[in-house]
């Protein structure tokens, strides 16, 4: 039997990354706690439970759950829809490419080693994360076209933050697949996903 609770949390992680990308592209900034939750997820590679990936508590996925609920209600921004569905598509490409998976694992391991020297949200670490996305994930499929303010999108730091968040979105998409998530559920079990998302969201204080 599918564990829809865990599937929804992972999918909320994907949607949270999509929302952060939108914020960065249109405002050049994102909610700092939510942004850190996304970055931190890249460093939790052996969680005991799915909540551990997102700071140990579902409240850290509040923005993602809100976004997912709007999306499942067909009330969401079309760009957000494109972002999170593109992340799921890229995860599908990644799962079929053993070389890319191995390289990604190696690069994430090296990323974790850099924690000794740099804060996770430092410009150096953001650049490393962005390069991992550009080198490994981006070539796997159709590039995600980000819409926003040209002035912001030209800034290297904003570009790096967006790519780092997209990498975190891939992390959540991998987790979604591991939890038993499928695209068929989004098509045929939307009500179940929506009800579960609302139930989890209502538990956040």
From Swiss-Prot:
One of its GO terms (cellular component) is cytoplasm. The keyword Secreted does not apply. InterPro entries: HflD, HflD-like_sf. Keywords: Cell inner membrane, Cell membrane, Cytoplasm, Membrane. Pfam families: DUF489 (PF04356). It is a peripheral membrane protein. HAMAP family: HflD_protein. Belongs to the HflD family. This is High frequency lysogenization protein HflD homolog.
């Amino acid at each position: 039997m599918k564990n829809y609770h865990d599937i929804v949390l992972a999918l909320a992680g994907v949607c949270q990354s999509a929302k952060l990308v939108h914020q960065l592209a249109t405002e050049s900034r994102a909610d700092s706690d939510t942004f850190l939750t996304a970055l931190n997820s890249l460093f939790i590679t052996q969680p005991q439970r799915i909540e551990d990936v997102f700071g140990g508590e579902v409240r850290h996925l509040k923005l993602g759950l809100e976004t997912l609920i709007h999306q499942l209600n067909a009330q969401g921004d079309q760009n957000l829809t494109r972002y999170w569905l593109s992340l799921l598509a890229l995860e599908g490409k990644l799962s079929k490419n053993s070389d890319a998976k191995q390289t990604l694992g190696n690069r994430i391991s090296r990323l974790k080693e850099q924690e000794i020297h740099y804060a996770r949200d430092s410009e150096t670490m953001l650049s490393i994360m962005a390069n991992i996305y550009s080198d490994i994930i981006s070539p796997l499929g159709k590039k995600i076209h980000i819409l926003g303010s040209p002035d912001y999108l030209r800034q290297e730091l904003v570009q790096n933050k967006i790519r780092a968040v997209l990498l975190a979105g891939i992390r959540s998409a991998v987790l979604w697949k591991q939890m038993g998530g499928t695209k068929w559920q989004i098509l045929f079990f939307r009500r179940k996903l929506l009800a579960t998302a609302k139930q989890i969201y209502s538990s956040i204080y």
